[in-house]
Amino acid sequence: MATPSAIPTNSKRDTTAQFHRVTRGNRSLWYQLTVLQQPERARACGSGMKANSDRRPVDPPPVVELRIVEGPTLEEGKDVTFDYNANFFLYASLEHARPIASCRVSTPTTNNPPILTGVPASGMAYLDRPSEAGYFIFPDLSVRHEGLYRLTFSLFETTKEEQDFDIQPADGDLPPGVDFRMEIKTDPFSVFSAKKFPGLMESTQLSKTVADQGCRVRIRRDVRMRKRDTKSGGNNNNNNNAGNNAGNNGFERREEDFGRRRTVTPAAEDPHGIRNRSQSNSSEHRASYSDVSRRPSMVDSYPPPPPPPPSYDPTPSAPRHLAFGESSGPKYPAPRQYAHQPGLQITPVPANGPYPSAAQSPYAKTDAPYGYSRHLPPSCPSPAPSVNRDLYDRRQSTSTYVPPSPSVYSTEGHYRRDSQASYPPTPAAAPLPRMNTEPSRGSIKISALVEPMPVIEPQVDPLPELPPVNVGGKRKHESVFAQNTRPLFNGQRQMDPHYGRSHRGYSPDHDQGSYSRADGQISVIQFNKYEY
């Protein structure tokens, strides 16, 4: 007869339970269950929609050992764990470690039992290490609510041979051949919330040994313990919010790395260099600036003129005249009218002569007499429409005086209107208001200036109007299918103008039908004559 007896031990970690029974074949069998690996902590997974996706198992996974001994006593008997022909499985259930006193008012805590999720049943695996025995492993057990719990393991046996059956069945509710043998409980363990969970520990040596023999156990090589805040003056709230602090520290580290990678654009040392920037390559050959205290003259406000008239002197200083691409474009539009004084004689200078220096320039101390403010900076860019207005003004003033315009193309065929390298050397000239227009220029002619004008704005006679081209025979939908725009009431329908007597003036006979073709013509079709 089966006589169960639970003998707890005082071991620190292992919990042992024993059971003895006598079979029909008069065999004395001893069962011994030992919890080799106790659960220590777990994280509550909750009962929401994300409970199954974000679930942590009990750490470390519980491992229970089973030994079967045949003999008069457990110490004198023979170990028949591998020779005994039967199947065993262990079922795990969860219970509170501290008994809850019953109260008069029912609360959700007392009504809802602790919920264990995962795989609560395990079959026995025969392993050689750490010792030859049968082992039950629970690698996938989770608890839904936080608290202090313990696991209860129930051992069931499925007997295969009749001589190993019990003399008297212990439980009539179980199917024949399945018997409940014994149960064992683990030590209490804590289930933390997701905020307070300290993290998973490194896998134990027992878990690694079991996994090496083919059992499905998750192995963690590193410690995944949450780092606590160890700052001075911290309280319990800081320890509880360790996850938030770790996130903030990581954010601060990312900010520091980002600030270390950022580069600050250095400030310009020369303030004049910022104002003189343009799309030209003048920065590569920039000459030294002249004295800041010098008053801006009218020469600085205009780009260099074309070669024919020795009018402007674009060289306020010798180094700037020789620099390529110094001027970035027309500064101001050309004046509309220029008042000239015929009393001044201009001596022509040969083209290959030396260039006058800055001290010999007659514009060094001359004010701008044409109403332009001398307070404007010489490098102020002008708007783009000034070129067209200059071309229009030049047509009106060609009879008296033709001012050089920056929009006229140079005779060398260059399209850079803002570069001095496109023009030949320009001779020195007198101030503008005292220019004489008498034709004593040698080989210089005004026609050389007017000649490129038709290229800039060609005046072409309008082309004769071409006859209309017949694209196809299709007509617009409105000309063929004209619709009436007035509203329709009481079942009225649109009137077809092709069948109206007033539009076509054609009335077919009763045995004929007319229809409109695609080209707009009316065709007649003869109906078949049937006798009724």
From Swiss-Prot:
Its main location: nucleus. It is found in: Nucleus; Cytoplasm. PROSITE patterns: VELVET. Residues 26-220 form the Velvet domain. It comes from Gibberella zeae (strain ATCC MYA-4620 / CBS 123657 / FGSC 9075 / NRRL 31084 / PH-1). Keywords: Cytoplasm, Nucleus, Sporulation, Transcription, Transcription regulation. Belongs to the velvet family. VeA subfamily. The C-terminal PEST domain is a region rich in proline, glutamic acid, serine and threonine residues that is required for the light-dependent regulation of development and secondary metabolism. A motif (Nuclear localization signal) lies at residues 40-45. Residues 233-250, 397-411 have a biased composition (Low complexity). This is Developmental and secondary metabolism regulator ve1. It comes from the Eukaryota. One of its GO terms (cellular component) is nucleus. Residues 481-493 have a biased composition (Polar residues). InterPro entries: Velvet, Velvet_dom, Velvet_dom_sf.
